[in-house]
Amino acid sequence: MRKKCLILSIFIFYSCSQNEYRIEKGKVGKLIKENTVRQLDSIYSNDSIVKRIGEGDYMFSGDDKYLIYSRKKEHLLTLTPRNQHDPSEPIETIQIISDLFQTKKGINVNSTFGEIDKKHQINGIQNTINNLIVYVDNIDAYFIIDKKNLPLELRLGTENKIEKINIPTDSKIKRFMIGWN
């Protein structure tokens, strides 16, 4: 009986620790889409929050940013609300910094374009001046990939239509972002 309780306890602990860093549609770890700035202190009570509010040294910043650090001083996430200076604002964008955070299918900040393409449905690719933005709607994510990975003839300008086949599978993610509009 004790052995069964121990195994069950280990399973529950493992499941909870996995969910703490899981990325799903409408959820990033402990944070859900409906959470507001006001709730961040209680959600991350065991972590550290650095608040870069658009004042003082950051007064010319167009956004407030909330940097979430673990107790081990590892930068985990950067959260940006829709509007500045309003604690009732929901979080609009999340930059995934730590490789602890991953999708159910194992995609994290160290993944490649090929892994994303293999494990998630890509809904669109936007060509910008220096980067590609790869959209994965089923997890509210977009991935920024440097255009330096593309063949030379596709790197310049924004008018070229970039298809999945044009992006080398070993292209690394520059940024892993979650967008909640």
Walk through the language-model features, giving the residues of each.
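Serine/threonine-rich low-complexity intrinsically disordered regions
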Residues: 1-2, 24, 108, 146
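Alpha-helix boundary/capping detector
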Residues: 3, 66-67, 142-143
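Positively charged
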Residues: 69, 144-149
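Short, solvent-exposed loop/beta-turn-alpha elements that line the ligand-binding surface or hinge
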Residues: 152-155
